């Protein structure tokens, strides 16, 4: 068992952000304004930050990153997109030698669960949404999931890393799935397609196109085979071609996996002994 006897507890989050004995602050409280104030306070007090807060990064990341640069600290946010899939590190490091032509992904598990059940069970949107809420996949207010806002937050972050552009959440064309009917899904299937709710970012040559909307995908493509609450992101690079990343995009354990990975990476960077950084 893990010994937790020396762990200090505090009811004051800002006391944590200003404590000189703390090197890394991990923000998992959600929301935007309080989280923004907490993160900026930690940064201004010389602390590295780990967060899973996609809304915070998508809407205030430019300000946060500038503050981090000014104060010589890092902000890690792998868990903000696609849960346990290490997509941000893959884009920023593993595919760094590529020019990304486009990326497209199923990046909201709730919406994908709803569309999958509508197709496979012939069920109405409202019926499946109620089940998703009962299973804990959707919130009591499902607006962010079914109207594409959650996916737009994630796409904003993906595009920033893929194309080296500032975060531009306000410029994402966003359309949800709440108007999709059982008849729509059946008609798509009749013609050899599936309806998937995609986040798409594309280098058009004249700029970066950012959009989230329901999309007809041929059944024989890899993205069309992604069912339930799973996530998948396909990235087309000039050197590697189309590359698919697939896995659990949400949930406590996949998210925790990404958060802890960021903590470990920052911890290694704080270690002066190079021997601690070898991969074995």
Language model features with spans:
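Conserved active-site and cofactor/substrate-binding residues in soluble primary-metabolism enzymes
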Residues: 8-11, 20, 59, 82, ...
């Amino acid at each position: 068992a893990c010994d937790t006897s020396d762990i200090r507890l505090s009811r004051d989050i800002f006391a944590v952000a200003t404590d000189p004995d703390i090197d890394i602050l991990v923000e998992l409280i959600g929301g935007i304004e309080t989280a923004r104030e907490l993160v900026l306070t930690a940064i201004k007090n010389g602390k590295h930050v780990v967060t899973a807060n996609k809304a915070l990064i998508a809407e205030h990341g430019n300000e946060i990153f500038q503050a981090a640069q000014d104060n010589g600290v890092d902000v890690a946010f792998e868990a903000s997109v696609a849960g346990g899939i290490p997509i941000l590190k893959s884009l920023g490091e593993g595919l760094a030698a590529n020019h990304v032509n486009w990326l497209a992904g199923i990046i909201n598990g709730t919406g994908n669960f709803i569309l999958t059940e509508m197709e496979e069970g012939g069920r109405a949107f409202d019926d499946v949404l109620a089940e998703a809420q009962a299973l804990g996949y959707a919130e009591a207010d499902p607006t962010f999931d079914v109207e594409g806002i959650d996916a737009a937050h994630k796409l904003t972050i993906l595009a920033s890393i893929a194309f080296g552009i500032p975060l531009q959440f306000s410029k994402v064309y966003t359309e949800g799935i709440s108007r999709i009917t059982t008849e729509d899904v059946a008609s798509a299937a009749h013609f050899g397609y599936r309806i998937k709710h995609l986040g798409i970012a594309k280098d058009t040559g004249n700029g970066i196109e950012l959009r989230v909307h329901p999309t007809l995908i041929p059944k024989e493509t890899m993205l069309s085979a992604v069912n339930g609450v799973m996530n998948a992101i396909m990235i087309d690079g000039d050197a590697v071609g189309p590359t698919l990343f697939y896995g659990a995009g949400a949930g406590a354990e996949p998210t925790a996996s990404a958060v802890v990975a960021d903590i470990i990476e920052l911890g290694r960077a704080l270690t002066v002994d190079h021997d601690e950084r070898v991969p074995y």
